[in-house]
Amino acid sequence: MAKDIKFSEDARSLMLQGVDKLANAVKITLGPKGRNVVLEKKFGSPLITNDGVTIAKEIELENPYENMGAKLVAEVASKTNEIAGDGTTTATVLAQAIIREGLKNVTAGANPVGIRKGIDKAVAAALTELHTISRPVSNKDEIAQVAAISAADDEVGQLIAEAMERVGNDGVITIEESKGFTTELDVVEGMQFDRGYASHYMVTDTDKMEAVLDNPYILITDKKITNIQEVLPLLEQVVQQGRPLLIIAEDVEGEALATLVVNKLRGTFNAVAVKAPGFGDRRKAMLEDIAILTGGQVITEELGLDLKSADISSLGRAAKVVVTKDNTTIVEGVGGADAIEARIGQIRAQLAETTSEFDKEKLQERLAKLAGGVAVIKVGAATETELKERKLRIEDALNSTRAAVEEGIVSGGGTALLNVYAAVEKVSESEEGDVATGVKIVLRALEEPVRQIANNAGLEGSIIVDRLKREEIGIGFNAATGEWVNMMEAGVVDPAKVTRSALQNAASVAALFLTTEAVVADIPEPAGAGMPDMSGMGGMPGMM
């Protein structure tokens, strides 16, 4: 396909139009008084949202040059979302500001490479200062504040804070859609995996259709059990102790399963069989996790162990096990604290090394089951449209909270970016030429989030920015109440990681944009020609 090439000013101005179209659609959502954007969906109801990255991903422009500009800024939002999980609108606003200011200078004759150096130096100084002024999250109230600011909802803030308190920082918090109108928190204590009983005859509570085992022994193996003779010596030892047994195996079937069911129905012996969770190497790792948590041992041929020679000392133990049709939950395993901590350290090391998102998710789940627990926030709403919007906001709030726990918090409402203004200004004083110009471009961009938050609140942004520069560090404008307050004390805070990622990613893409000198795009194909004239064929009169 033939290509169209545009150079220098022509290329950059068309791409800038795309940047502006996307950024202008996204930035109206910024701040406590930001508006929503409605996104058309081919199927189902439209999506109403104020989530920057969701809006950015939906925008496709007809002009290929404008579309390239828009996609570059969408990349800023997407990367910020990937790293910090929130702050995508702030990142978009910063990118637009750096690009616009930078292009003015490039058009006036400045060298884009020098400007890029200045931008990099300014951002490095800003990030160092951000790290200095951030402080760690110290209590549940601060976690609630971060979540409430992100979701613009105090109730959501409290729910997320409670979830994090109950499952710990390593716990897994998932967000699901509820069938009701209210948003609720459901916490699963202990280790849960998604495998249920092998036979419904094993249930002990017929009303709830679940098997509850108090103080059971737990047999953990990666073998398939079909012959009861394989486990008979072990079963006899457990029967002598008068305690129930949970069997976790690759499968329990045939004669072995029938014998367990018959003994359960006769009241001779209470045993519940479940399939081992996961597949392949992940199954081995999860069985090892269960063994460490319960103080048992995985009976596997890889370790030279078999079921016939195993004795009661190889079995794990727990205070309680609850097995439903779909899930098994082990509560209060008796595994040693040192062994569990060592295993947690091992999983954390694997988490740090892996690059696969899927592997990260599975490792995080395993970590949560060992270290904390699993909390589920069930989101309720009156309509499907409201449910989707609310779920997106809660996901952002949860990501914000995790980011705050990781790297601490700074003053919110764009105040932190102006608090680093003086540190960046010092860099501009020590530089000259185009490098100094690059630093000044970042200085101007640091004002933009505060300006936009004020504009969205119906105020004159420039007046707010000017006053904020004169205020002492920590004092900011609370757009929700229209008051000048100490932002930390008022609970208007942002995660330092979110602010850092937004600035870093915006500057990275904007600097690349400014050094662009040529843009190549496909030439659109002309509309297809109509059918040829078929009149008079075969001696017939022409078609009318």
UniProtKB/Swiss-Prot annotation:
Keyword set, alphabetical order: ATP-binding, Chaperone, Cytoplasm, Isomerase, Nucleotide-binding
GO molecular function: ATP binding; ATP-dependent protein folding chaperone; isomerase activity; unfolded protein binding
Coiled coil spans: none
BP term (GO), one: protein refolding
InterPro entries found in the cross-reference section: Chaperonin_Cpn60_CS, Cpn60/GroEL, Cpn60/GroEL/TCP-1, GroEL-like_apical_dom_sf, GROEL-like_equatorial_sf, TCP-1-like_intermed_sf
Catalysed transformations (reactions): ATP + H2O + a folded polypeptide = ADP + phosphate + an unfolded polypeptide
SUPFAM superfamilies in UniProt: GroEL apical domain-like, GroEL equatorial domain-like, GroEL-intermediate domain like
Gene Ontology annotations for the cellular component aspect, listed alphabetically: cytoplasm
Major localisation: cytoplasm
Residues that hold ATP according to the record: 29-32, 86-90, 413, 478-480, 494
Enzyme Commission no: 5.6.1.7
Localization, UniProt: Cytoplasm
Subunit structure: Forms a cylinder of 14 subunits composed of two heptameric rings stacked back-to-back. Interacts with the co-chaperonin GroES.
Chain's role: Together with its co-chaperonin GroES, plays an essential role in assisting protein folding. The GroEL-GroES system forms a nano-cage that allows encapsulation of the non-native substrate proteins and provides a physical environment optimized to promote and accelerate protein folding.
Protein family according to the UniProt entry: Belongs to the chaperonin (HSP60) family.
PANTHER family: 60 KDA HEAT SHOCK PROTEIN, MITOCHONDRIAL
Protein name (database record): Chaperonin GroEL
Source taxonomy: Bacteria, Bacillati, Bacillota, Bacilli, Bacillales
Gene name of this polypeptide: groEL
